[in-house]
Amino acid sequence: LTAKDEVLLYKDAVSKDALFRRLYALYEISRGAKCIVADVEALMQIFPKKLPVLKLKEGEDVDFSSLASRLTAMGYVRSAAVESKGAFALRGDILDIFPVNAENPARVDFFGDTAEKIKPYNFITGERLPLVKELSVCAATDVFFEEGEQRRVKEILFGELSDFKDAA
């Protein structure tokens, strides 16, 4: 478990590898990992109470209409093509996603709200890997808002912005 990089001056805006490794460690802890290797700084930091995980299972229903907003709330970035961890693409009834807790991205074929096939693939070669019955997608961020909190924060920020505009 790595420490969270808090100094903005040193943050690498392009690479989220350290964050994803940290989230993967938290995901494994939530699944009952027996051993944790961490330095004191990492242990002294605040962790989310619960790490959101989206489970996609072959033959089970998911609210497809809210899938994009759910993934975005979990820190995933929507893109035209999935080229790195933390990205997803929706085209018709197909979801391509690269979970931060997976070695490879996967394509999930939907029929309506039902996940029909889950097909991992090698994102470098495009080679199809064996089908899986289930795909766990853990959060790609460690900052979460409860239902309603996001609206409250938005109102506060717009209020502050309005005050700032009035002062100018």
State the predicted function of each range.
Residues 1-168:
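ASCE RecA-like P-loop NTPase motor cores
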